[in-house]
Amino acid sequence: MNLTRREFAKANAAAIAAAAAGLPILVRASNLVTEADVTSLDWNKAPCRFCGTGCSVMVATRDGQVVATHGDIKAEVNRGINCVKGYFLSKIMYGSDRLTRPLLRMKDGKFDKQGEFQPISWEQAFDIMAEKFKAALKAKGPESVGMFGSGQWTVWEGYAANKLFKAGLRSNNIDPNARHCMASAVMGFMRSFGMDEPMGCYDDIEATDSFVLWGSNMAEMHPVLWSRVTDRRLSAPQVKVAVLSTFEHRSFELADIPMVFKPQTDLIILNYIANHIIESGAVNRDFVERHVRFAHGAEDIGYGLRPDDPLEKKAKNADKANTWSDIDFNAFAEFVKPYTLERAARESGVPAERLKALAELYAAPRRKVVSFWTMGFNQHTRGVWANNLIYNIHLLTGKISEPGNSPFSLTGQPSACGTAREVGTFSHRLPADLVVTNPKHRETAEKIWKVPAGTIQEKVGFHAVQQSRMLKDGVLNVYWTQVSNNMQAGPNVMQEVLPGWRNPDNFVIVSDVYPTVSAQAADLILPSAMWVEKEGAFGNAERRTQFWHQLVKAPGEAKSDLWQLVEFSKRFTTDEVWPAELLAKAPELKGKTLYEVLFRNGQVDRFPASDLAKGYANDEVDAFGFYIQKGLFEEYAAFGRGHGHDLAPFDAYHEARGLRWPVVDGKETRWRYREGYDPYVSKGSGVQFYGYPDKKAIVFALPYEPPAEAPDRDYPFWLATGRVLEHWHTGSMTARVPELYKAVPDAVVYMHPDDARQLKLRRGSEVRVVSRRGEIRARVETRGRNKPPQGLVFVPFFDANKLINKVTLDATDPISKQTDYKKCAVRIELLNLA
């Protein structure tokens, strides 16, 4: 059997993925037949439903069901391979407990907060929703209603939700679960470059000489990209891999420079590298003088806790966290001077020779470097700073915005970029990097949306963690969540999340496909369509927008989130939700429904149903009588075209395997800000960071500051949470795939063997993990894929029977408002020795 190197890499990646899950795999499958006339299968492309990598898969349907999937060999991202989760995509929609009817808590035929769930009609569901929304709006105004969305929304679902809440209901209290995963990356980009999202693309992998992973276990969280990294590392002798984490994991198996550091000291290591670059003469002076300016960021900014928390009261600049003052290069050099190799080694616990080897990767003038990071950086009380500090290193050396030189923030959800960030479903954002606090930005949105001036509120809405607090405090009273499971994924759930959901004055709606922990805590459950049961679009980590057609029908009465949002908008007239002074500016809108104003506005409804490609179903087209997905997308695209966020025409995406924006004159952009690649960069300039008016990026002077909570005598261990290869987020989909559940049925407490011995535990012992906020029971694992150092334990959060977020702290980055799930203090108590 003769294989090319690429064929071997593909086969090897498949074998690794299957072996990791304990699954058998055929030795050879070269006789695979996919022709529809032979198999009676219809094959169509779709992006994978899981992570932010954006793999494309081919989906087989027969008799109205998805029956198989395989990697799309025409896709640039994954080149025909999938990870183990991707291989089981065909099973995620068919769990035995799929939700198919709206369910309301009832007693004696009426809604009762303490009642049992009983099936009702969609008409009844929207009746009680409208009643609750209208009552709250009348009594307390737009601040009393809110929505929690998702980086798993399709582009048009997020856009419709954004429009409904910010323009229709005039509430900025809409935020996505991407607040928990990508908000620090967003603010890092915005502060350093004035624009969001990576400048590079996955093609950097094959062009670089060095990979540095900062708080990223790509081997399990982005395994298809890791297969490309592995291929590059094993194909070229000069290529090096450095991995930094607070515990050892599978990505360390490829590391030339492995580094386990003490929590929070990544800030020290980053500043040390900048200092090394300066002191060794490795600064790219010409690049820095032409393209960079320097600033000193506010310090002592707090920890995003409640205002009455002692740590918040103590912080000097909690209300000025996102401010800075200009400095020059010399001042920056003086600032990082104390971050010596000796200090970095002493405080981080990483051997000095490894730190120096890491710094030399960045400093070597002819060596290209790609820095990858995910939640280790972002879920951090100084996550924005960490993002800024890695950009400092690439900017000082000029190793940025060109093939093989890239600081690259990887996303965790399939459309955290495409929907949460680009569409602007955060409580402070509007599409294409616009923000609600800027009057010109609000004016732009109001003109595109054809609503009166002053419709969009200036005040930033409640962010994700704040939403939970405001529900608990009774400020937020009606709350709708879609495509998220915050009762399992949110921090400090017993003290700060559950109380607000069960507050008798509040009404909580959950739209989902399965009875998740969140659904079970709600008052009303709406059954949703998922993945290829609807037409959709996702945007991945390399700015690639990908479309798919609806391929099958949703079961029972389940409806897409888009249908739910748009249909619900018919329940409100402008007279009910807009003040008289606003209606006076647009009397022609008086008495119209929000559906008519927002979705039948002559723009969203301008594409007829006949524009839908022949042979495809589209339940929303059938329901509303026009091609609503196309209308929403083209209206949304108007925000970015001509402003560096250009999207291609709608129909182009159904033909392509995705396009990376900005797309200008039909051509996608692989590297932003670099002449010859980016059409927005002026000829002769070389590089322009055009997010700022002066077209320069900012290098920030930012110090080390300690975490919000650290181990002590009563709680002597660090706790870090995260994911495993076989499960995705809270396991609501993957736990219903028998093969994946069998491979990893339970979350365990990964612990160093010496810590276990000191506590008189052994592998398999049942323990209690206790923090100041809550506790869980789980079994100890002292072997296997994750190897914490002494003093740290790691617990995944996929297991609904072991809610580790009962234990976590709701501290957030004060700039991004993103939660730090990687650092809190716990103790371990023996329950059963085993």
Swiss-Prot record:
Residues the record lists as binding Mo-bis(molybdopterin guanine dinucleotide): 85, 152, 177, 181, 214-221, 245-249, 264-266, 375, 379, 485, 511-512, 534, 561, 721-730, 805, 822
UniProt PTM: Predicted to be exported by the Tat system. The position of the signal peptide cleavage has not been experimentally proven.
Gene: napA
Keywords for the protein's UniProt record, in alphabetical order: 4Fe-4S, Electron transport, Iron, Iron-sulfur, Metal-binding, Molybdenum, Nitrate assimilation, Oxidoreductase, Periplasm, Signal, Transport
Record-annotated 4Fe-4S Mo/W bis-MGD-type domain positions: 41-97
BP term (GO), one: cellular respiration
Residues that hold [4Fe-4S] cluster according to the record: 48, 51, 55, 83
Signal sequence range: 1-29
Assembly mode: Component of the periplasmic nitrate reductase NapAB complex composed of NapA and NapB.
Described purpose of this protein according to its UniProt entry: Catalytic subunit of the periplasmic nitrate reductase complex NapAB. Receives electrons from NapB and catalyzes the reduction of nitrate to nitrite.
Documented EC number(s): 1.9.6.1
Cited InterPro entries: Asp_de-COase-like_dom_sf, CT_Nitrate-R-NapA-like, MoPterin_dinucl-bd_dom, Mopterin_OxRdtase, Mopterin_OxRdtase_4Fe-4S_dom, MopterinOxRdtase_cofactor_BS, Periplasm_NO3_reductase_lsu, Prok_molybdopt-oxidoreductase
Keyword Signal: yes
GO-annotated cellular components: membrane; nitrate reductase complex; periplasmic space
Subcellular localization: Periplasm
Name of the top EC class for this enzyme: oxidoreductase
PANTHER family recorded: PERIPLASMIC NITRATE REDUCTASE, RESPIRATORY NITRATE REDUCTASE
Coiled-coil portions: none
The protein, known as: Periplasmic nitrate reductase
Cofactor: [4Fe-4S] cluster; Mo-bis(molybdopterin guanine dinucleotide)
NCBIfam families: NAPA (TIGR01706), PRK13532.1 (NF010055)
Hydrolase among keywords: no
Reactions it catalyzes: 2 Fe(II)-[cytochrome] + nitrate + 2 H(+) = 2 Fe(III)-[cytochrome] + nitrite + H2O
